[in-house]
């Protein structure tokens, strides 16, 4: 009877260990999906709207600068006109329009960023060197609001995540 009880205890311990491993793998998968944009996310953040006007048009470099500023300020997820921005996202000027994730976007450009709204808004609102002040001074139309509930959709583009063909894990 003691041997049987010991076996049952051993099996239960292995089962518990497997459940813990499964939970850990599930959490890591969930985190990875968030990082690569495969799931929609919601949280506090900011919404920045840039619009073309008669004097100045918004160009791809404006959007790239804004995305970089938001990333530096700790944005965890970003989208422009509902195009999820990933590490491999390109923002390209083509004639009179902008391509993001191979999709054409037009003004107004609504940039959503999830992260600490105080950090995000402070980084963009710095006097003299902040994105908003700098762009307004040169005549571009830029507005920002802090939001408690920003929703950013999952990436739904055709592009696959980058496949590593040459970079290998170091042994």
Model-derived segments and spans:
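Soluble extracytoplasmic domains of inner/organellar membrane proteins
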Residues: 52-142
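Extracytoplasmic/luminal low-complexity segments enriched in Pro/Gly and acidic/polar residues
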Residues: 121-122, 131-171
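Structural signature of extracellular appendage/secretion-system components
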Residues: 1, 7, 49-52, 159-170
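Charged, low-complexity, helix/coiled-coil-prone segments
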Residues: 2-17, 65-69, 142-154
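Short flexible coil/turn linkers enriched for glycine and charged/polar residues
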Residues: 40-42, 104-105, 146
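Juxtamembrane "stalk/linker" segments
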Residues: 1-49
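Phosphate-binding glycine-rich loops and adjacent basic patches that engage nucleotide phosphates
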Residues: 23-34, 82-85, 161, 171
């Amino acid at each position: 009877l003691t041997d049987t009880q010991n076996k049952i205890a051993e099996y239960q311990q292995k089962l518990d260990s497997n459940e813990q491993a499964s939970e850990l793998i599930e959490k890591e998968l969930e985190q990875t999906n968030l990082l690569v944009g495969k799931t929609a996310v919601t949280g506090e953040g900011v919404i920045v709207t840039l619009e073309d006007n008669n004097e100045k048009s918004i160009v791809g470099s404006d959007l790239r600068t804004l995305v970089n500023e938001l990333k530096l300020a700790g944005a965890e997820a970003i989208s422009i006109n509902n195009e999820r921005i990933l590490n491999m996202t390109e923002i390209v000027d083509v004639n009179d329009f902008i391509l993001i994730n191979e999709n054409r976007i037009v003004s107004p450009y609504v940039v959503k960023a999830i992260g600490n709204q105080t950090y995000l808004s402070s980084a963009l609102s710095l006097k003299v060197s902040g994105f908003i002040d700098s762009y307004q001074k040169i005549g571009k139309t830029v507005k920002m609001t802090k939001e408690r509930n920003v929703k950013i959709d999952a990436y739904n583009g055709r592009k696959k995540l980058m496949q590593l063909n040459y970079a290998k894990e170091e042994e």
